[in-house]
Amino acid sequence: MTVAETIREILSREGRTQIWVVDRMNEIMPEISMDRSRFSGIVTGHRNMTADELLAFCKAMEISPDVFLN
């Protein structure tokens, strides 16, 4: 499963919107300056996710980064 597919699955399972996640990621790690357009690119697979962005996503969703290692 790709990073984008994993993110889509997590968002669906948890009932969270991209807007909610972007806002939460910026609260947790303001230095990443995530915006909706960039996150949408990640979710659709058109853009790669940096390590910091991945960590912020995991913290926002309260999950372990290990879910992306499968």
Task: Kindly give the residue locations of the regions a language model identified.
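A short, Lys/Arg-rich alpha-helix, primarily the initiator
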Residues: 1-24
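Flexible coil/turn residues that form the inter-helical turn or adjacent wing/linker of helix-turn-helix
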Residues: 3, 14, 32, 47-50
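Conserved hydrophobic/aromatic packing and binding residues within compact polymer-binding modules
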Residues: 7, 21, 39-42, 68
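Helix-turn-helix DNA-binding elements, focusing on the entry/boundary residues of the two helices
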Residues: 18, 36, 51-54
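Short alpha-helical "recognition helix" segments of helix-turn-helix
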Residues: 21-28, 57
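DNA major-groove recognition helix of helix-turn-helix
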Residues: 25, 43, 53, 69
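Recognition helix of helix-turn-helix/homeodomain-like DNA-binding domains
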Residues: 29-48
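DNA major-groove recognition helix of helix-turn-helix/homeodomain DNA-binding modules
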Residues: 50-67
